[in-house]
């Protein structure tokens, strides 16, 4: 199950520099045991980011599997979570609206495989983005890093196929 929760935030101390602090808010809401599991994983089955759309700040949380959905989005969409405070900040941040979009993986795969692909795609990064290669952060990603990241995210969303492992552990065609 693929899910995206969008929360419209209202408060004086919201800006893009707080997006890493929102990670802390998220970790405080989930079960301690699940938070520990996430810290041990090399690839998280979720992403979160803060964007500004016109005059609204929108905090987005996306999950790639059922467990992440239950542990994260279910807790964040709860009626009792209507405001929070970022550590070391004075004022509360209110959540004025929540929107949940759920898509079954089968529907996504059907769309991906049955609709004709384009020859060219434009990629627009909505937040600052970096990729890790050989333990170093790359702030200017190349196509191989983008593909690698997409394959890892896909593999994290399914138990049926590990795309990344297949690609990087298979013998080369010349062998």
Named regions from a protein language model:
Residues 102-148:
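Surface-exposed beta-loop interaction hotspot
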Residues 4-8, 58, 85, 94, ...:
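Ser/Thr- (and often Asn-) enriched beta-sheet segments in non-cytosolic proteins
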Residues 79, 124-130, 153, 157:
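Mid-sequence acidic-hydrophobic segments that form the walls
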Residues 61-116:
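Acidic, low-complexity central loop/insert segments
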Residues 138, 158-167:
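Short acidic alpha-helical/loop segments enriched in Asp/Glu that coordinate divalent cations
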Residues 21-34, 146-162:
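Active-site helix/loop of acyl-thioester processing domains in fatty-acid/polyketide metabolism
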Residues 1-66, 70-72:
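N-terminal ordered "arm"
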Residues 168-175:
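Conserved small/polar residues in nucleotide/adenosyl-binding loops
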């Amino acid at each position: 199950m693929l899910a995206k929760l969008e929360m419209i935030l209202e408060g004086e101390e919201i800006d893009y520099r707080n997006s890493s602090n929102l990670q802390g808010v998220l970790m405080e809401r989930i079960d301690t045991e699940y938070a520990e599991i996430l810290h041990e994983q090399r690839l998280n089955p979720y992403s979160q980011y803060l964007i500004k759309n016109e005059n609204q700040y929108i905090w987005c949380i996306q999950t790639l599997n059922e467990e992440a959905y239950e542990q994260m989005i279910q807790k964040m969409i709860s009626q009792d979570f209507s405001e929070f405070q970022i550590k070391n900040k004075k004022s509360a941040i209110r959540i004025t609206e929540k929107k949940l979009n759920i898509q079954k993986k089968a529907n996504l795969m059907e769309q991906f495989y049955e609709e004709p692909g384009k020859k060219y795609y434009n990629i627009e990064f909505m937040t600052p983005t970096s990729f890790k290669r050989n333990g170093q952060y790359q702030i200017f990603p190349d196509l191989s890093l983008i593909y690698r990241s997409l394959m890892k995210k896909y593999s994290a969303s399914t138990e049926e196929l590990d795309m990344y492992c297949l690609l990087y552990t298979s013998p080369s065609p010349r062998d």
